[in-house]
Structure formats: structure tokens, C-alpha cells
Amino acid sequence: YTKEEYKTLFDKMKNTIPGVAITTDIIVGFPGETEEDFQDTLDIVEYCKYDGAYTFIYSERKGTASSFMEDDVPLKEKERRLHELNEVVNKYSRESNEKLLNQVVEVLVIGISTKDENKVYGYTETMKLVNIEGSTDLINKIVKVRITDAKSFSLDGVVES
């Protein structure tokens, strides 16, 4: 897709599906990627304001078409681009999550938090990670949760009575 075709498809999704959450995967430093190409990537991220993104530095995978291409982007440049990209992605991810502050959302509780054994965690219908004050009897249940804090990668909340 061209940038304009991509934007058109993105806008169609946003305008057709209320509340849709859109994430993406982005590789930086692909063979032949120029600074202009990278800036185009940043432009798209700024335009789309993704709910989240999985970002990676290009690395060769044997047998793929790109493994036969010259890996001409220096590692330091790949690292710089990844850092710059992540700053932008994280900003929009946090802003997306902050829209849920004080909102009540449904969460499918999956298990015990790895960071706090007094909390459980689960996911909203748009796959946002929520850490919840609550006991293990909530696991495998869908519960209504009021969002109390928002970060780039997760939300915190309490079960609504």
C-alpha cells in the first residue's frame, strides 16, 4: 500500500467500527530503509495514533527474501530509530489508555498478576491489559472494572460492585 491508501483504509476502519482499537507491528532498519522511509513510518504512526504497537529491529531470518539483501542499516542507526519510534508509539498508547480513566469496562480475568500477588489481571474486549485489585475467584470470569490508572502498556482498575 502507499501511505495514502493505508490512511484511507485506516480511516475507513475508524469510521466504520465505533471504539475500534488498532495495533500494528513495525520493523525498523529493514535492508534499504532510508531516513526518508523511517520518517514516513513516523508520519503514519503520528497519523494513526495506534492503541499499541509491537516494534522490532530488523534481523536476518535465513531463507527469507530479505536474507539475500544487504543489511545496510548500521545497528546503531537501527537502535536510534527504534528508540525514536518507541517514544512516539508509547505516547499514543498512553493517550489511548488515558481515555479509559474512570470508565467502567468489561474484563476477562485470566490469572494472578506477576507483579503483585494481591492482584489479578485480564483483558478488555480491545485486548488492553488490566491489573485489578481482587482475589483469584475472579479468574475465568468477565467482570466490570472501573479504570483507576493508565500507563502506556496497561491499565489498573477496581471491580465495580
Residue ranges and their predicted role:
Residues 68-161:
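Terminal RNA-binding accessory module
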Residues 1-52, 60-77:
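Conserved non-cysteine loop/helix-boundary elements of the Radical SAM core domain that shape
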